[in-house]
């Protein structure tokens, strides 16, 4: 049994087309729907994303993901955390790059995730394959006392700590730690290293990505 992620715009019937997709960001309900627009439009008041109705399912998903990063920054007011007029949702080039990297979650050949485990054994961000290892016991603890993991972007490794100070770390914290390190990987591979300096922003994205993907996950025998 393996965890996979379903493209919500991919119809189950070949003769049909998915015209709208609903999902949550935090406590907010958003609807992404096809419309007669040239470029993707976001209405933050009505919480509606309008996507060019000529796009296929893969392109529609790409636009949804791009909008997702923008909406997270807006709804959680992450821009206030960035100095010197930089933006938490980054510029258009970085946004496109992040969306491209994140879209790999919908290709099950780019990650190895067994059913009923907290996180995958490995995953790909662009051309870089990251492998995830559990560390049984360490004396290291972050200053926040919440995240228990570390990323090595040169070797493509993520270490998740299982025990600290002789106490088991709960599954929920290990899961959050993985997504936290995953967001670090996204920012690094998108050449947006400065975003890694603000742990609150990384954690905010990590939480929302985890919830976003959870809404579109399924399981297959593989």
Language-model segments: residues:
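Basic/hydrophobic alpha-helical interface regions
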Residues: 2-3
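Active-site scaffold of zinc-dependent metalloenzymes
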Residues: 9-62, 74-91, 109-172, 188-189, ...
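Active-site recognition of the HExxH zinc-binding catalytic motif
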Residues: 62-75, 176-188
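Long, well-structured alpha-helical subdomains associated
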Residues: 109-110, 219-222
């Amino acid at each position: 049994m393996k965890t996979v992620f379903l493209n919500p715009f991919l119809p189950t019937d070949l003769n049909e087309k998915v015209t709208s997709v609903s999902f949550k960001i935090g406590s907010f309900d958003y609807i992404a729907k096809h419309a007669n627009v040239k470029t993707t439009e976001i209405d933050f008041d009505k919480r509606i994303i309008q996507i060019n109705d000529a796009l296929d399912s893969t392109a529609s998903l790409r636009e949804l993901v791009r909008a997702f990063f923008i909406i997270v920054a807006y709804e959680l007011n992450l821009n206030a955390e960035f100095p010197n007029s930089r933006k938490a949702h980054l510029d258009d080039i970085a946004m496109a790059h992040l969306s491209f990297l994140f879209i790999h979650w919908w290709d099950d050949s780019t990650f190895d995730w067994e059913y009923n485990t907290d996180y995958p054994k490995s995953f790909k961000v662009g051309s870089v394959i990251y492998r995830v290892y559990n560390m049984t016991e360490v004396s290291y603890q972050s200053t926040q006392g919440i995240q228990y993991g570390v990323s090595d972007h040169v070797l493509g490794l993520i270490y998740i700590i299982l025990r600290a100070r002789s106490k088991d770390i709960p599954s929920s914290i290990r899961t959050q730690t993985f997504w936290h390190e995953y967001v670090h990987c996204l920012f690094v591979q998108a050449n947006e290293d400065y975003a890694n300096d603000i742990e609150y922003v990384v954690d905010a994205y990590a939480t929302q990505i985890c919830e976003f993907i959870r809404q579109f996950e399924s399981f297959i025998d593989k």
